[in-house]
Amino acid sequence: MKEIYITDYNCVTPLGFDVESNWKALLEGKSGVALHKVIDNHDAFFVSKIDDEKLEIEFKRFFDSAQNDNFTRLEKMFLLSLKPLVERHQISDETAFILSTTKGNISLLKNESTLPEGVYLSRLAQKLADFFGFKTQPIVVSNACVSGVMAISVAKNMIQARKYKDAFVVAGDEISEFVISGFNSFQAIGSEPCKPYDKNRNGINLGEATAAAYITSTPSANEKLKFKVLGDSAINDANHISGPSRTGDGLFASVQNAMKEAKASAEQIDFISAHGTATLYNDEMEAITFNRMNLQNVPLNSMKGYYGHCLGASGLLESIIAMESALNNTLIPSKNFEEMGVSQDLNIIRENQSAEIKYILKTASGFGGCNAAIVLGKA
């Protein structure tokens, strides 16, 4: 089976418009989460949102001003993420273009009596692909909050099946009234900055971001970074439309399968980048899963305290930050965690610390019972 590598990546978030600025902000403990007015005639919510003015300035730095009105706010975020990668890697007729998103241009629906074409995820993917000159039909991965992790898996499996030689994966979602209203109806949104795994956690903060990665089976010798995608799995727990299996069955099976394919034991995993939404049931289910897999002593964090829950972007964005941790031999703390609030022990990272990181486990879970896991190895 071909070995698959991630050799390049980028991200656009409230903490910065490239990986370097994001990493610097994380080392300084900065968070994008703040109070923002999202819904008219409703109190502000704690969300992680990109400043509109800064986004416009950044877009005009890299793209012709005549193009400004041709793209939605989310599309501009996608273009900014992808542009550096497309400039560094050649697109061929054997290159896949994979889009991960949960809601795409859902904001286009507001105040519309008919369905705008741009709201279709396939149309969004095609528009982005056409702009950069991709020659293959785009692939859309939209499976709730595991979409970003699954997009990496899809790229890996498609290349190993010899359907493509390489792939550009881009993932993203934006803060919208639609999404905020939906999560609020579940009473899942926290009334303060989120505290994954903490005793006093009371819900999620939503966020927005885009992230992009280049994945190939033929890395060049001079790549600045190189991570093998060693194993992957996605299992549905078939429990409930909005609640995970209380015993973590779906996530357990996903982690077990991914580690088996990677031929990695619990002792070999150096770091877990977990989903950690700060909801009561998700965090508890993860703690049970990691203990079932004998991973309770592995250093673990959730990035939700920095970025909020970025939906379709979260899995890819958090994988990128995990790889940066490995490159810089630095573990980032799980922000806002103070006191253990799950029934089983976890090794929650509490402060910046040096560590040799070779094997990374990245997990995600979401509505509809979906779960996904990948194992990455520093090459």
Residue ranges and their predicted role:
Residues 15, 20-100, 106, 254-266, ...:
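Conserved active-site "lid/cap" helical segment
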Residues 152-156, 210-218, 316-323:
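Alpha-helical metal-binding/catalytic segments enriched in His/Glu/Asp
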Residues 1-7, 358-359, 371, 378-379:
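Extreme N-terminal starter segment of soluble prokaryotic enzymes
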Residues 241-247, 277-294, 312-317, 351:
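Short glycine/threonine-rich loop-to-helix capping motif typified by GTGT followed
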Residues 8, 26, 82, 97, ...:
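Conserved small-residue
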Residues 87-98, 126-137, 160-167, 189-198, ...:
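Structural signature of cysteine-dependent C-C bond-forming condensing enzymes
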Residues 2-12, 19-47, 51-52, 193-262, ...:
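Condensing-enzyme catalytic core mediating Claisen C-C bond formation in acyl metabolism
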Residues 35-76, 104-154, 179-206, 221, ...:
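Conserved catalytic cysteine-centered active-site region
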